[in-house]
């Protein structure tokens, strides 16, 4: 017979068991060659240009005009702008202050012209992001994002519907950003 203490311990271990679950985007088109898209993605300092874009009223107006109204409200865009302005970029990391505290995404693997792999640092949630690029045509590349998140069963069930949207949201964003020289 198993004692109550042992049963509670086993239940506690089961509840805290974390597994990596992967979520994958659809395939998106980048209007740049595979090499150009990779070059833009592999050095995260290039994303510093986002700060300038969000600070320029003309570019903000252009962004608002080209976003579907049901995706991002002007208020949400202002919130995003505020977050982007606080971000810090190095060649290998993007750091941001979040509601959970400072969080970073760091490049841990680069496979020239094909893959950039990032992992979270200083985050309460372990996550990995794989961005894959494949030549699609003379001046286009195909882009796919896979996000792996390490969560316990109960937390995963609570946030899964939101996490499932993340790869497509990120892939759509990257396909637009990487298309711009």
Language model region names:
Residues 23-25, 100-105, 125-130:
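Short, surface-exposed coil-to-beta transition loops
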Residues 2-88:
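Hydrophobic ligand-binding cavity/cleft-lining segments
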Residues 37-41, 47, 107, 118, ...:
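Hydrophobic pocket/interface hotspot
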Residues 117-168:
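Beta-strand/loop substructures that line and gate deep hydrophobic ligand-binding cavities in soluble
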Residues 34-36, 93, 102, 111-113, ...:
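Residues that cap or initiate secondary-structure elements
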Residues 61-121, 180:
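Glycine-rich portal/gate segments that line the openings of hydrophobic small-molecule binding cavities
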Residues 45, 163, 167-179:
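Short amphipathic alpha-helical signal-transduction/dimerization elements
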């Amino acid at each position: 017979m198993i004692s109550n203490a042992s049963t509670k311990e086993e239940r506690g271990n089961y509840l805290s068991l974390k597994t990596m679950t992967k979520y994958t985007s659809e395939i998106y088109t980048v209007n740049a060659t595979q090499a150009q898209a990779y070059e833009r993605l592999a050095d995260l300092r290039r994303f510093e240009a986002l700060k300038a874009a969000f600070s320029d009223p003309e570019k903000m107006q252009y962004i608002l005009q080209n976003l579907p109204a049901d995706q991002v409200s002007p208020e949400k865009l202002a919130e995003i702008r505020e977050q982007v302005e606080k971000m810090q970029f190095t060649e290998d990391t993007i750091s941001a202050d979040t509601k959970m505290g400072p969080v970073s995404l760091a490049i841990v693997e680069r496979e020239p012209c094909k893959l950039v792999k990032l992992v979270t640092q200083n985050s309460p949630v372990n996550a990995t992001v794989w961005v894959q690029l494949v030549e699609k045509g003379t001046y286009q590349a195909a882009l796919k994002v896979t996000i792996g998140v390490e969560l316990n069963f109960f937390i995963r069930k609570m946030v899964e519907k939101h996490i499932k949207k993340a790869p497509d949201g990120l892939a759509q964003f990257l396909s637009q950003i990487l298309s711009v020289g």
